[in-house]
Amino acid sequence: MKSSDIRQSFLDFFVGKSHAIVRSAPVIPADDPTLLFTNAGMNQFKDVFLAKGTRSYSRAADTQKCIRASGKHNDLEDVGRDTYHHTFFEMLGNWSFGDYYKEEAITWAWELLTVVWKLPEERLYATVYHDDDESFRIWEEKTSIRPDHILRFGDKDNFWEMGETGPCGPCSEIHIDLTPDGSGRALVNADDPQAIELWNLVFIQYDRQVDGRLEPLPQRHVDTGMGFERVCAVMQGKSSNYDTDVFRPLFDTITELTGVEYGASMHDPQDIAMRVIADHARTLSFALSDGAMPSNEGRGYVLRRILRRALRYAKDLGYNKPILHRLVATVADSMGDVFPELRDRQDAVARIVKAEEESFLVTLDRGIEIFNGLVGKVRGEGSSTLEGEDAFKLYDTYGFPFDLTRLMASSAGLQVDGEGFERCMQEQKTRARQDRREKQRGGAEEGSWEWFSDLHATEFTGYDGLEADASIIGISRSKKNLLLVLDRTPFYAESGGQTGDRGWIETGEYRLEVTDTQKDGDSFVHVVTRAFDNVRDSEADPADIAVGPGRVHASVDRKLRQATERNHTATHLLHAVLRHTLGAHVQQKGSLVNPERLRFDFSHFSKLTPEEIDAVESAVNDCIRQAEATLKHADVPYDDAITKGALAFFGDKYADLVRVVEIPGISVELCGGTHVDNVGQIGLFKIVGESSVAAGVRRIEALTGRAAEELMWNEYRELHDVRQLLKMKAEEPPAEKVAAILEERRALEKQLAELKAEVLLVKLQGDASALEDVCGCRIVARVVDGADAEGLRYAAQMLRQQFPLSAGLLCSSAEGKVSLAAFASDRAVKELGIDAGKLIRQAAAAVKGGGGGKAEFATAGGKNPEGMEDACRVFREAVRCIVKA
């Protein structure tokens, strides 16, 4: 029975039992930022079990996409080494929401397995919770299972809980005995591949209290799950999930790419590598098609680890090129009928994966070289443990996830100091945290504050106005600055990428200039860098002035705040446009919003083309021209914000009450920053830069409002000046004429270089001592005065063509920089084995430089002109030795 038929027969069976067939939820949870990946069929029904949601149906069945690659439910380390663990798998399941219960769940499971699929009854075992007599009785009286095949187990194996508190209940599992003689009773629940769990039937009937008590739920539910790959192996008579038709297309593609056949043996390193690559290709295809992106944090880092792990295993197949992106199409072809998103996003997923592979392969070989050196060092010291600091260096410098280093170390017979690695990781985080804290305190030392109130919190009034009367509740001094905390303030403190407000605080005696505002816990720290003494009508040192508790008037610089607000609202427009233009995989990875400009980092797999940049810029300006788009701000419960469509990303921390900024019809985001009232106030949006920040992360820099206008006016004036210089009309595009001038210049420069080379060649030919004949081979090694690097190259090429059996090195210097050009004729390379690339590296050492190239021609540079004669001598002697040998 084919895997596709097995899946369909499961769904058809439950349609016959009046179940609604629901679509698989994405593997990226849409409304649960606490969960990395969907890891069970019940995830999408979690709200029902928690009595926070309902469905229009009371019976459901589906095949759910699942990923288990991190945290408690983590199969990553076992993948490839056994027959049945995967990071991606399908979970077949059926559910009852307050409808049927134990009897139907048990009898229907038995009917499907033994009547429809015709699995041998004598090979099946049922486990029940040790005091669940009801389930035991149903198995005994309502099915034809052998009574001695009903086994009782305790909490560890047969009691399901969602968490430390909440919905829970006993479960009944169905296992199959795969031992040759049917003697697997003792292997049930022993994590043995010869007695595997097929189906878990969970009966949710209790609510676990904080004190551990179990209270009956008002409604009882059924939640079942069956591993699709496992049941396919059983139905197809295979001893391994990987031997089924689920994986065969992937192995065929890997064989086609690498030339390595699958099926040598269970423990063969190349078979293990092929299983890992096949599994990881599925995981990446499904995760990325559901909107995930590789990154350095959260679920994105898990995916990056998986990809890099697979690339490391590809080396065991002798394959050193990107491979996973070639498998994306295979996954889509074999599973796209059931999960159409695989085909819909196939090209985009392949591009993302390929970009990630190419990025890591740049450092992989160097990292492996460093790792091998560390292995030699450890063995030389008589140790068997790789230091945590070394593992951290591989992670920090070469992008080696810790589990990849541990895997490589295990293959080398070594262990890795995990505690030491974690210590280095924590030290790095602590340093970063301390740097952030110092900035938030405005540079003040810990404990240097003088407080005038038991409450240190600041009330922010800056959403509604830019001025406020307030009281000073805290003072500190840092170097030449004065730091103030007020009980209320209109100054926005830096957070969410928006820089802190600037402005003034009036005390009566002093006018204090605030040049930054930082947030330290609940306190807003106003950084004062200049002070004006109103009484003496002169400037004062802010670190020395006498300021104590009292009333003040705080006012934000209106012009700067408005410029910041234009830039901040523009980032929301930009984010929405990027998601619409490039795809839903685009997620904000960072931002900087200040009065001068905006910077927006986002997940994307490739450099934006000029056409894409133009399209994004044009779309943002189209949004701005919709001047009727008035922003809406509201503080709402987090769940309501998510329901409204506001984006929430894994790892972000949100309070129960969140601020939602909505640009109607365009964008809904959780954001605590300040914004314009109407998008028309932004005026103009102009992209000034697009670049790479990290693998899979791009950056756009842009200007808005007056800054964007000034940039465009400056560019217009410069273009006008260029047209005048070229004597062109206003309507004529200057690009073609400039290109023609540059092409003409390049041609003239080439002619000049050739003329210089010919002069140099004549000079060398006229100097009898320049060309040495050794056993018929012409050798030249000379310092040439006044020649530039281009002239040296042309002269070397001419000498190479003029003398059929020859080798030479030409050197010159200008402004302390040395240029070298070496050559070897075709006959010198083939008949004598002369290699200009190797020889120039030896010679370059004399001028404190380096270089290289091919055997026929090579170049180098250096910074020691005094060593040029030595370089010539080294080259000449080396060639003599080769020729005479």
Swiss-Prot record:
A cellular-component GO term for this protein: cytoplasm
Gene Ontology molecular function, alphabetical: alanine-tRNA ligase activity; aminoacyl-tRNA deacylase activity; ATP binding; tRNA binding; zinc ion binding
Cofactor needs: Zn(2+)
Location(s), subcellular: Cytoplasm
Cofactor binding summary note: Binds 1 zinc ion per subunit.
GO BP annotations listed: alanyl-tRNA aminoacylation
SUPFAM superfamilies assigned to the protein according to its UniProt record, in alphabetical order: Class II aaRS and biotin synthetases, Putative anticodon-binding domain of alanyl-tRNA synthetase (AlaRS), ThrRS/AlaRS common domain, Translation proteins
Catalytic activity: tRNA(Ala) + L-alanine + ATP = L-alanyl-tRNA(Ala) + AMP + diphosphate
InterPro entries: aa-tRNA-synth_II/BPL/LPL, Ala-tRNA-lgiase_IIc, Ala-tRNA-ligase_IIc_anticod-bd, Ala-tRNA-synth_IIc_core, Ala-tRNA-synth_IIc_N, Ala-tRNA_ligase, Ala_tRNA_ligase_euk/bac, DHHA1_dom
PROSITE patterns registered for this protein in UniProt: AA_TRNA_LIGASE_II_ALA
Transmembrane segments: none
Broad class of where this protein is predominantly found: cytoplasm
Domain of life per record: Bacteria
EC code(s) of this entry: 6.1.1.7
Pfam families reported in the protein's UniProt record: DHHA1, tRNA-synt_2c, tRNA_SAD
Keywords, in A-Z order: Aminoacyl-tRNA synthetase, ATP-binding, Cytoplasm, Ligase, Metal-binding, Nucleotide-binding, Protein biosynthesis, RNA-binding, tRNA-binding, Zinc
Homology family: Belongs to the class-II aminoacyl-tRNA synthetase family.
Domain notes from UniProt: Consists of three domains; the N-terminal catalytic domain, the editing domain and the C-terminal C-Ala domain. The editing domain removes incorrectly charged amino acids, while the C-Ala domain, along with tRNA(Ala), serves as a bridge to cooperatively bring together the editing and aminoacylation centers thus stimulating deacylation of misacylated tRNAs.
Classification via HAMAP family: Ala_tRNA_synth_B (MF_00036_B)
PANTHER family, per the entry: ALANINE--TRNA LIGASE, CYTOPLASMIC, ALANYL-TRNA SYNTHETASE
Functional note: Catalyzes the attachment of alanine to tRNA(Ala) in a two-step reaction: alanine is first activated by ATP to form Ala-AMP and then transferred to the acceptor end of tRNA(Ala). Also edits incorrectly charged Ser-tRNA(Ala) and Gly-tRNA(Ala) via its editing domain.
Official protein name in the record: Alanine--tRNA ligase
Lineage: Bacteria, Pseudomonadati, Chlorobiota, Chlorobiia, Chlorobiales
